[in-house]
Amino acid sequence: WLHRYLKNGNATLLRTDPPKAHVTHHRRPEGDVTLRCWALGFYPADITLTWQLNGEELTQDMELVETRPAGDGTFQKWASVVVPLGKEQNYTCRVYHEGLPEPLTLRWEPPPSTDSYMVIVAVLGVLGAMAIIGAVVAFVMKRRRNTGGKGGDYALAPGSQSSEMSLRDCKGDTLGSDWGGAMWT
């Protein structure tokens, strides 16, 4: 029975859960930036996080917290470095853990700027307006082509001179029985 418990325990003890890692960006009042490399949800607890500047490992200027339990049987850890604003892309975080087939190399990825979204929306709006105007122009031109360019197939009724008739020219004395026999005077 002891052998069976050891066999079942090995599956738990020998398991490896690779870390889920990402980098966050935090502006400081001093005008520079803190980059923080997070490793979450890993097992076993042994992990190494390092920061590099242009490929050279930083050791002195890095803040590193101890590995902590996450409360779900896995662990978490972070390492941070303070960098000049605008130089964030020169820094990379390396994550070493036995659950990873090879070490991870992470860099802070700035979110897409709202300015680029505004440009995209404006361009799409202009293109949409041009498409609508083009469709209207094409419709009008096609309609004119079909009518010979005269604006329509209208002709006067036979025997009519104009449409300027007055009510006095009408010969009917009544509007008919449907109108209650009202008379024109």
UniProtKB/Swiss-Prot annotation:
CDD domains the UniProt entry points to: TM_EGFR-like
Membrane topology: Single-pass membrane protein
Lineage, top ranks: Eukaryota, Metazoa, Chordata, Craniata, Vertebrata
Name the UniProt record assigns to this protein: H-2 class I histocompatibility antigen, alpha chain
Record-level GO cellular component terms: lumenal side of endoplasmic reticulum membrane; MHC class I protein complex; phagocytic vesicle membrane
Other noteworthy facts: Sequences of three cDNA clones that encode portions of three distinct histocompatibility antigen alpha chains are presented. These chains could not be precisely identified.
InterPro entries the UniProt entry points to: Ig-like_dom (IPR007110), Ig-like_dom_sf (IPR036179), Ig-like_fold (IPR013783), Ig/MHC_CS (IPR003006), Ig_C1-set (IPR003597), MHC_class-I_related (IPR050208), MHC_I_a_C (IPR010579)
The organism of origin for this protein: Mus musculus
Subunit structure: Heterodimer of an alpha chain and a beta chain (beta-2-microglobulin).
Keyword Cell division on entry: no
Function: Involved in the presentation of foreign antigens to the immune system.
Keyword Cell membrane: yes
Biological process according to GO: antigen processing and presentation of peptide antigen via MHC class I; immune response
Chief location of this protein within or outside the cell: membrane
Cytoplasmic side: 140-185
Keywords: Cell membrane, Glycoprotein, Immunity, Membrane, MHC I, Transmembrane, Transmembrane helix
Organism domain of life: Eukaryota
Family assignment from sequence similarity: Belongs to the MHC class I family.
Membrane-spanning parts: 119-139
PROSITE patterns attached to this UniProt entry: IG_LIKE, IG_MHC
Domain Ig-like C1-type: 19-107
Extracellular side: 1-118
Pfam families found in the cross-reference section: C1-set, MHC_I_C
